[in-house]
Amino acid sequence: MFGKRKDSKNKAMRDNEELTPWERQQLLREENIEKKQKKSKKILVSSNLVKFNGLRKRRLQKRVITLASIFGISAIISLYAILPVSRVSNIEIEGTDSQTKTAIIEASQVKKNESLFAVVPTKFLIRQRIKNDVATVKDVNISLKKNVVKFKVTEYDIVGYIQRKNTYYKLTSNGRELNVGQKATNGNYPLFLDFKKKTLLHEAAQQVGEMPKKVRFGISEIHSSPTKVNPKRVRLVMNDGNEVIGSIDTLATKMSYYPSMAKALGKKGVIDLEVGAYAYPYBK
């Protein structure tokens, strides 16, 4: 075996000896190039391996950081959820009376000791429930201060009351009726009486809402007094002792003439605004 290797080596040496100097130089050059290529491949493979290991390490670190962050945030939320500060401690309402406050709390469905996580994401729905269920609320702003829920209310004008049995319900300028009643009226608002149809009641309330406040506050009672000719006929009892006959659909416009007509009448009487406008004293 060793003899064969020696013979091969001797043969290669003899072959080299038979080459010209230029050919030997070319052969050496090719051998050097081949060695450099092999070395370059080794370096490239080694470099790629280092890059792959580095990329793998960075991905692993990123995954560990992500998981740690998720677990950390979950732990903080879980801890916060069991603390008293995460629950509603109080409910404050600004811009309305005690009766409407009760209605707002009921409509909001927000309760003391309820989790704030149930309140914050549903603020829009709470606002819509209040506006839909509480007739006097025109708009409501909901905010949180620490763990106190605050409602800042903007209301429609109150234009009067409707009596049902022994309970009085507020009527608003948009023609709606508050669903929470009270045992007595308050404020200088007229009482709506004898209205059998809610559509006429709400239309009358809207008309009163369009009147100047000075005229509106001069009305004591508004009676539905329909006839076959005019189902929208109403009779108004004024605080100054006069009576006004009118029609719901033109009430706001024609009542603007009332102050000057009452002054021209000179004594207590009836001002008829149903068709045209004229007045006569009671003793006529």
Swiss-Prot record:
UniProt name for this protein: Cell division protein DivIB
Cytoplasmic compartment residues: 1-63
Gene3D superfamilies: 3.40.50.10960
TM segment ranges: 64-84
UniProt keyword annotations, A-Z: Cell cycle, Cell division, Cell membrane, Membrane, Transmembrane, Transmembrane helix
Tagged with keyword Transmembrane helix: yes
Family of the protein in this entry: Belongs to the FtsQ/DivIB family. DivIB subfamily.
Gene Ontology BP annotations: FtsZ-dependent cytokinesis
